[in-house]
Amino acid sequence: MFPSRRKAAQLPWEDGRSGLLSGGLPRKCSVFHLFVACLSLGFFSLLWLQLSCSGDVARAVRGQGQETSGPPRACPPEPPPEHWEEDASWGPHRLAVLVPFRERFEELLVFVPHMRRFLSRKKIRHHIYVLNQVDHFRFNRAALINVGFLESSNSTDYIAMHDVDLLPLNEELDYGFPEAGPFHVASPELHPLYHYKTYVGGILLLSKQHYRLCNGMSNRFWGWGREDDEFYRRIKGAGLQLFRPSGITTGYKTFRHLHDPAWRKRDQKRIAAQKQEQFKVDREGGLNTVKYHVASRTALSVGGAPCTVLNIMLDCDKTATPWCTFS
């Protein structure tokens, strides 16, 4: 969308009736009574929809000793219509913002409304997916992005692999459709922390076609770090050209970094053979091998900004990657 703001990356080597009204209405029913009844019906309908989408209804029934028939009903995969759907000035493409997440609620409360405002000002059709890992394994950012890719709406045609603690501040940053190749928004020249030339983390845009071509990301990286370096090799192996922003003059003030290492410790432990394995290229696994279960899918509004929270339970083959647990 903004070709003047993109450049090829300069590299070293070129994801019946209601029970509330049973028995009918009394003969003399005031307008006030009708209003209260309608309001109550609306409230309980919304409450039932929320519980049924999150799976809480099934859990509540089982808690009362009753059996449910089949798994909890999944919410519709398509996000609700947005105000821009009929506005051609917003362009034909739609972005799925994939946010790997675990226990960073303070950052999330800032991230969702900020990204909503930022992308709306740029007229980027989008929907935010919070990929919340709820199993007991170590955090796996790459596998969560694979899940987000598979579970995102078919109406989206490109993705942003987006850290929850990195907020774009410069309005000239391009979040448009990356037709020519993967676009690394948080380039080494602009990221507040990481400056090596092969870095592709933080914020990376890819078309869904190109992400499939790379077979997604490796699922072998449990704990913090290195999954982006392996994905860089996948990008090059797929024959794709990596692009980065050009003409941005705000330097390391281009983004706001929310992470506080003093109270938000990262899991940087290397267990068993993980230290040796982390530098290898996973030539077999990826999008086609990720194993998971979506425990619930819930539509939320954070500060008036809509998003979808996927509670995800990843599966780990402890024979192949014993470092997925701390034991």
From Swiss-Prot:
Residue ranges that the UniProt entry lists as topological domain Lumenal: 52-327
Disease in which the protein is involved: Ehlers-Danlos syndrome, spondylodysplastic type, 1: A form of Ehlers-Danlos syndrome, a group of connective tissue disorders characterized by skin hyperextensibility, articular hypermobility, and tissue fragility. EDSSPD1 is an autosomal recessive form characterized by short stature, developmental anomalies of the forearm bones and elbow, and bowing of extremities, in addition to the classic features of Ehlers-Danlos syndrome.
Function: Required for the biosynthesis of the tetrasaccharide linkage region of proteoglycans, especially for small proteoglycans in skin fibroblasts.
Cofactor(s) listed: Mn(2+)
Protein's organism: Homo sapiens
Record family assignment: Belongs to the glycosyltransferase 7 family.
Localisation per UniProt entry: Golgi apparatus, Golgi stack membrane
Tissue: High expression in heart, pancreas and liver, medium in placenta and kidney, low in brain, skeletal muscle and lung.
Pathway note: Protein modification; protein glycosylation
Membrane topology reported for the UniProt record: Single-pass type II membrane protein
GO molecular function, one term: xylosylprotein 4-beta-galactosyltransferase activity
Enzyme Commission (EC) number: 2.4.1.-, 2.4.1.133
GO CC terms of this entry: Golgi apparatus; Golgi cisterna membrane; Golgi membrane; membrane
Protein name: Beta-1,4-galactosyltransferase 7
Enzyme class: transferase
